[in-house]
UniProtKB/Swiss-Prot annotation:
The gene is hldE. The keyword Transmembrane helix does not apply. GO terms for biological process: ADP-L-glycero-beta-D-manno-heptose biosynthetic process. The active site is at D264. It comes from the Bacteria. It comes from Klebsiella pneumoniae (strain 342). This is Bifunctional protein HldE. Keywords: ATP-binding, Carbohydrate metabolism, Kinase, Multifunctional enzyme, Nucleotide-binding, Nucleotidyltransferase, Transferase. Residues 1-318 are annotated as: Ribokinase. InterPro entries: Bifunc_HldE, Carboh/pur_kinase_PfkB_CS, Cyt_trans-like, PfkB_dom, RfaE_dom_I, RfaE_dom_II, Ribokinase-like, Rossmann-like_a/b/a_fold. Its EC number is 2.7.1.167, 2.7.7.70. One of its GO terms (molecular function) is heptose-1-phosphate adenylyltransferase activity. It catalyses: D-glycero-beta-D-manno-heptose 7-phosphate + ATP = D-glycero-beta-D-manno-heptose 1,7-bisphosphate + ADP + H(+); D-glycero-beta-D-manno-heptose 1-phosphate + ATP + H(+) = ADP-D-glycero-beta-D-manno-heptose + diphosphate.
């Protein structure tokens, strides 16, 4: 299937549903409580993240699309924290405040990347007048390409049929992440995205793929749906549409750390891709790739365009490509468990030339994995002058990540990558040029950890500076 890269900046999506605040308490455990046979967690870090429908909206915004969110909250600190967190990531919120109810909050306590307990603070919003939400939907319909209804059965979507009717009359597709077994509520929707458990709770246990397809097609006909996407965890996802053969996509996940919010990512990417003008098949392709990325992260998470770019070309976030420092540490840890030798180098790599490619290929031959650390734009200006870099950081990193010799690409803001190298501690640190090993940033830390430091020669006659001078000279003719 040929997939067109979505123009997410063109897309506008409205998310309506159950919003909540996810709180995370992190800390080590080293003893058992004397009061009860439970571990004692010394809380050292607290995080607050938007959850539920708010996480869907964040996933849409993280792709660069215009994301609007309508939901019910209380008038409390949790609502204010939720609004601020969403504003920080460019989600446009239009909440209906309900003074008699608290904002739904879920508190998770974690230690060593394991969730120990979850505490829920909620009363549900059933019985709240839905008219203010209908008015907000009506106002937004002229500026969106998709409507997402994110149902967590907390009371925000008690009038789903009215919402579907409003959108369909305006020609806007309606995507629903369902909850419960009453799918009659979702009659006439464009697409439902149940997971396998939710699907089987409605149609019964399916013994094989054929039964999933047969019962799914009956569900589509019964509830007048345009399509059905069944997400199947480690088995990927299956798209069913009337008059078309089923489309099954295997999972792209490399490592699974946490499935929290994965369904939010799927429907968010689906909606943003459809609103960009892509087909439903293409939207599912991107959503499947995004799901493979997000389950490799801890807690509710989003996927950036760079991560999605890596994933769709088969370079999953936990395995290969452009990544953040924290993601790189996870990938390196996984490589070490496999007994792989990690090589690391760094540079500006402004205009990639034959000398760079040859150098990186030679560096890769010295181990099993190659990390390339790249100076940020600000760092490059300080080192090379105000006219550099010619190519911005994101473009430099994407080009490097596309090289067969390069496994991981990461950026750093400082003048040297010493701090980054000290955090990664590669088995072998290499640098090109006329350096002495002791002059290379990070060499002391690598040696102290038992690693090696090596200087490689650049190919003669290749220089970014000379290329720039030649371009300038030719343009002056």
């Amino acid at each position: 299937m040929k997939v067109t890269l979505p123009e997410f900046e063109r897309a506008g999506v409205l998310v309506v549903g159950d919003v909540m605040l996810d709180r995370y308490w992190y800390g080590p455990t080293s003893r058992i409580s004397p009061e009860a046979p439970v571990p004692v967690v010394k809380v050292e870090n607290i995080e607050e993240r938007p959850g539920g429908a708010a996480n869907v909206a964040m996933n849409i915004a993280s792709l660069g699309a215009t994301s609007r969110l309508v939901g019910l909250t209380g008038i409390d600190d949790a609502a204010r924290a939720l609004s601020q967190a969403l504003a920080n990531v460019n989600v446009k919120c239009d909440f209906v405040s309900v003074p008699t109810h608290p904002t739904i909050t879920k508190l998770r306590v974690l230690s060593r990347n394991q969730q120990l307990i979850r505490l829920d603070f909620e009363e549900g919003f059933s019985g709240v007048d839905p008219q203010p939400m209908h008015e907000r939907i009506q106002q937004a319909l002229g500026s969106i390409g998709a409507l997402v209804l994110s149902d967590y059965a907390k009371g925000a979507l008690t009038s789903v049929q009215t919402m579907i009717k409003l959108a369909r009359e305006a020609g806007v597709p309606v995507l629903i992440d369902p909850k419960g077994t009453d799918f009659e509520r979702y009659r006439g929707a464009t697409l439902l995205t149940p997971n396998l458990s939710e699907f089987e709770a409605v149609v019964g246990k399916c013994q094989d793929e054929a039964e999933i397809v047969e019962r799914g097609m009956k569900l589509i006909a019964e509830f007048e749906l345009s399509a059905l996407l069944v997400t199947r965890s480690e088995q990927g996802m299956t798209l069913l549409q009337p008059g078309r053969p089923p489309l099954h996509m295997p999972t792209q996940a490399q490592e699974v750390y946490d499935v929290t919010g994965a369904g939010d990512t799927v429907i968010g990417v689906l909606a943003a891709t459809l609103a960009s003008g892509n087909t439903l098949e293409e939207a599912c392709y991107f959503a499947n790739a995004a799901a493979g990325v997000v389950v490799g992260k801890l807690g509710t998470s989003t996927v950036s365009p760079v991560e999605l770019e890596n994933a769709v070309r088969g370079r999953a976030e936990t395995g290969f490509g452009v990544m953040s420092e924290e993601e790189l540490k996870q990938a390196v840890a996984a490589a070490r468990k496999r007994g792989e030798k990690v090589v690391m180098t760094n540079g500006v790599f402004d205009i990639l030339h034959a000398g760079h490619v040859s150098y990186l290929a030679n560096a890769r031959k010295l181990g099993d994995r190659l990390i390339v650390a790249v100076n940020s734009d600000a760092s490059t200006k300080r080192l090379k002058g105000e006219t550099r870099p010619v190519n911005p950081l994101e473009q430099r990193m994407i080009v490097l990540g596309a090289l067969e010799a390069v496994d991981w690409v990461v950026s750093f803001e400082e003048d040297t990558p010493q701090r980054l190298i000290a955090g990664i501690l590669p088995d072998l640190l290499v640098k090109g040029g006329d350096y002495k090993p002791e002059q290379i940033a990070g060499s002391e830390e690598v040696w102290a950890n038992g690693g090696e430091v090596l200087v490689l020669n650049f190919e003669d006659g290749c220089s970014t500076t000379n290329i720039i001078k030649k371009i300038q000279k030719d343009s002056d003719k």
